Amino acid sequence: MENTPFQFTLSQQRALEQLNEFVTSASSKVFILKGYAGTGKTTLVREIIRLLKEKELSIILMASTGRAAKILSNITRHAATTVHSAIYEYKDFNQNLEEIAKERQKFKMDKSGQLYLQFELSSLPESDKQHFYIIDEASMVGNEKDKSATQAFFGSGQLLDDLLHYDPKGKFLFVGDICQLPPVNEEISPALSEDYFRNRFDVLAKCAELTEIVRQDDTNDIIIASHKIRKLYANPPKTKWGKFPLRSCRNIKIFNDQASMLNNYVNRLKTDGYNKSTLICRTNKSCDAITSLIRPALGLTQPKMQKGDLLLITQNNLISGLMNGDLVEVVSVGTQKFRANLSFVHVEIKELFTQKVYSQLMIEEILYNNQTNLTQEQQKELFIDYYIRMRERGIRQKDFLFKEKMRTDIYLNALRVVFGFALTCHKSQGGEWEHVYLDIPRSFPLNPTKETYQWLYTAMTRAKTQLYISEGFWLE
């Protein structure tokens, strides 16, 4: 460690020493590296990768979302993928499509229930080396079954279970911030909990926590204020109305009202483009309402998508490689096509992070009906339509070509998007922007709980340079 170019904090040095012991220990399987905003988790991950490479160990870098994986790859200069794409592979549909098609044709009805893709744990490639897995943004790695899934089911449905079972001999380093929001519909972040590993897996997880703000962030008032919010999260005061210590901060601008804040956001989008700023809302409904104000202010006056619109990808896309959470700008809008009771439109889009342009179909119903994805019924119609098209070409469900063509079918792989001018906090997780605007509803501070402060902490730490909020009695 003497030759490293970094000046580590005391907690970083201690964590590195513990990690070195973990790497060489034959019995240790899981290490949890916790750290709040600005404590240098990413710097430490880079150093860990360097040390592991020196030891010629097999490193597999993962993140909980596609956006987080891209950011991680860029920062560490080491290839990263999502946990899902690393450990699962497509197996088959959960039902026989031919039987469903016959029933529909014979009885003019369908009682077969939900139709979805089944993904199973993929086989680990044979190797003499022990694999070392680093999972970033691990606060979003859940272990509850997703009951709202409409298109695909993965393994046992419990991601953390499956990850550990994927490589029983592997070592796992989970990196994250326990103050960030946990996975949707879960009360804690299981991958960052020593108690969870002990109770669920009988695994004694090693743990280190970064507590000191690193030198380059100790003058950033967003980081300093976020640590005050973190303390409120750790010990929520019993009060009817929460108070947020966000006043008198150089990096936090307070507007007189929401309208002034939105006007500033619109002007910044016009001046700087879409890459540097975002607006975070409490609910999807609030996102929709604010989007209806922002689009006309930007000159996007058509009710339907047009050139210059900002979109958020809501599902990983096999054709383009675009990931759930990626933001794209519409370059052009082409012709419509209709299949499976759905409307598709050809679009050219530019991914903000890489500026790369993609050309493919997009499903309109999701964008215009305030959905984030297709319903079970819509998804089923799309699957059956694909089956019929393949059957007409003599390709059956169990054929190798059936599976292969699924990966490139333009309708199955049409983009699923929503407008991206305003994001929920969960959708923003794993991302960061120079400028972040927060829409805090008046009812938000009422009877505050740990989740109240957790949401605010997660949202405000998406901002690197400047945070914007509107005036409220809850500010102090």
Predicted regions and their residues:
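Short, conserved phosphate/pyrophosphate- and ester-handling motifs at nucleotide-, phospho-/glycolipid
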Residues: 12, 65, 283, 430
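Conserved SAM-binding loop
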Residues: 8, 61-62, 279
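Conserved helicase motor core of P-loop NTPases
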Residues: 15-19, 27, 158-170, 178-378
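ASCE RecA-like P-loop NTPase motor cores
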Residues: 1-4, 38, 472
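ASCE P-loop NTPase helicase motor core
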Residues: 16-17, 21-240
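C-terminal accessory regions
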Residues: 347-476
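Alpha-helix-centered segments that form part of catalytic cores
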Residues: 115-128, 254-263, 400-423
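N-terminal pre-Walker A segment at the start of P-loop NTPase domains
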Residues: 1-18
